Amino acid sequence: MDFILPELGEGIEEATVSFWMCEKGDKINKNDDVIEMLTDKATFNVPAPVSGVLKDILVKEGDIVKVGQKIAEIE
């Protein structure tokens, strides 16, 4: 399943990856925080949309990601 960056708040179109709270191959549970994102207004923890294994991480720390962009794959 594609893990996309969800809406973070009104008017926020992109955010910077602060850090991943898990690694490729880790088992994750739905609603567990897995990535921290930074904007000019706030810091957001983004939860996993589903339970599974983090198959691939597509963005790294420091990358700027747009809302709706695929950031990882969950299997």
Predicted segment positions?
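Acidic, low-complexity mobile loops and tails
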Residues: M1-M37, N45-S51, K55-L58
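Flexible, nucleotide-binding loop/lid elements of kinase catalytic cores
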Residues: A42-F44, K70
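C-terminal structural segments of small proteins and small subunits
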Residues: I57-I74
